UniProtKB/Swiss-Prot annotation:
One of its GO terms (biological process) is chaperone cofactor-dependent protein refolding. It is found in: Cytoplasm. Belongs to the GroES chaperonin family. Keywords: Chaperone, Cytoplasm. This is Co-chaperonin GroES. It comes from Prochlorococcus marinus (strain AS9601). Its main location: cytoplasm. NCBIfam families: PRK00364.1-6, PRK00364.2-2, PRK00364.2-4, PRK00364.2-5. One of its GO terms (molecular function) is protein folding chaperone. PANTHER family: 10 KDA HEAT SHOCK PROTEIN, CO-CHAPERONIN GROES. Heptamer of 7 subunits arranged in a ring. Interacts with the chaperonin GroEL. GO terms for cellular component: cytoplasm. InterPro entries: Chaperonin_GroES (IPR020818), Chaperonin_GroES_sf (IPR037124), Chaprnonin_Cpn10_CS (IPR018369), GroES-like_sf (IPR011032).
Length: 103
């Protein structure tokens, strides 16, 4: 089996799935205390990197996704599958797990 090189451009989400680049979590508290990895909150904000074609409806049509590549979004805390690519963190989740588009 040939090795597959994963990059953001080679990841094509299926259905209503969205591929999000996770925003970096805070390294320090407001008081300047450095946080160990175990004490950091899991980020819930990121930028949409790839978008699937949309949910397939019962009649065979597709429901167009409400987000686009480049949108900054807020998503459910424990949603999706965490993926690391090239030192960056991503999450692959269903569109229903996106709570809001942040402007």
């Amino acid at each position: 089996m040939a090795a597959v090189s994963l990059t953001v451009s080679t990841v094509k989400p299926l259905g209503d799935r969205i591929f999000i680049k996770v925003s970096a979590s805070e390294e320090k508290t407001a008081g300047g205390i450095l946080l160990p990895d175990s004490a950091k909150e899991k980020p819930q904000v990121g930028e949409v990197a790839q978008v699937g074609p949309g949910k397939l409806n019962e009649d065979g049509s597709r429901q167009t996704p409400e987000v686009s590549i480049g949108d900054k979004v807020l998503y459910s805390k424990y949603a999706g599958t965490d993926i690391k690519l090239g030192g960056d963190e991503y999450v692959l989740l269903s569109e229903k797990d996106i709570l809001a588009v942040v402007s």
